[in-house]
Regions:
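Extended amphipathic secondary-structure runs
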Residues: 4-14, 35-43, 48-53
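Surface-exposed, low-complexity/disordered Ser/Thr/Gly/Pro/Asn-rich loops and linkers
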Residues: 1-15, 19, 185-191
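Extracellular hydrolytic enzyme modules, especially secreted metalloproteases
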Residues: 42-44, 48-231
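Acidic, glycine-anchored loop motifs typical of Ca2+
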Residues: 18-41
Length: 231
């Protein structure tokens, strides 16, 4: 990542100020996130190899797996200058996404979804149980949809859309809110518009489930036992 940033800094045709329009973390604490802060807003790096998630090509397991992460701390970019932020008068980079140069739209959109705060919706533990959303979401295996994998990714899940609206603002997602107890055993009918068509019907239908009941093993002896707070 730092090598890529050095290449960017050395290119006179690139004005990094164009990519610093947001104060995503409100670094100066003034409540305004719509202002430059010295950090590159959305750093997307394309590496020149097949991604490990697609087999890795000649590099195999030594290839880079597409991911979103950060540099541990803001990294001032040598050879740059910025009047904003507190990075020694330089532009800085912090979080990033990286994907292969031959990445299809699905991988790029999936990683950018992480950049917007969305988590993976696939079974990251590979437990064998899989995930219910599967190809219905680009944050799951929907990022690989299409005759040529990843060229026709599916959309974001209802949960992801709700998250994006809540975190980024807007009033474009509307739908019914239903309690589980109100569902009719014989079925309920709700009209949904297609995801690519904004009509008068619901965009989503949310069914509120009760809190998950997690049975615990009884104490070995007595009435109480210690719990580690995890698991």
């Amino acid at each position: 990542v730092k090598e890529a940033l050095a290449q960017v800094a050395a290119d006179p045709a690139i004005d990094l100020a164009e990519f610093d329009q947001e104060d995503r973390y409100d670094l100066n604490g003034n409540g305004n996130r719509d202002e430059p802060d010295g950090l590159i807003d959305h750093l997307m790096i394309f590496h020149s190899c097949v991604g490990e998630e697609a087999g890795g090509g000649d590099l195999g397991e030594n290839a880079i797996w597409a991911h979103r992460w950060n540099l541990g701390a803001p990294y001032p970019i040598p050879g740059t200058s910025s009047p904003n932020g507190d990075f020694g008068g330089q532009f800085a980079a912090y979080d990033y996404t990286i994907q292969p140069i031959d990445a299809a739209a699905g991988v790029c959109a999936h990683e950018y979804g992480h950049d917007l705060g969305l988590p993976d919706e696939y079974d990251t533990k590979y437990s064998g149980k899989g995930e219910p959303v599967a190809t219905w979401s680009i944050m799951s295996s929907g990022s690989w949809a299409g005759v040529i994998g990843g060229t026709e990714p599916t959309g974001f899940s209802p949960w992801a859309k709700e998250f994006l609206q809540a975190s980024l603002g807007g009033n474009w997602l509307h739908g019914s809110n239903v309690q589980l107890a109100d569902l009719n055993p014989r079925g309920n009918v709700y009209m949904l518009d297609q995801a690519n068509d904004k009509g008068r019907n619901d965009d989503v239908v949310r069914i509120n489930l009760p809190a998950k009941q997690v049975p615990l093993n009884p104490p070995y002896a007595g009435q109480y036992q210690y719990h580690g707070g995890k698991g």
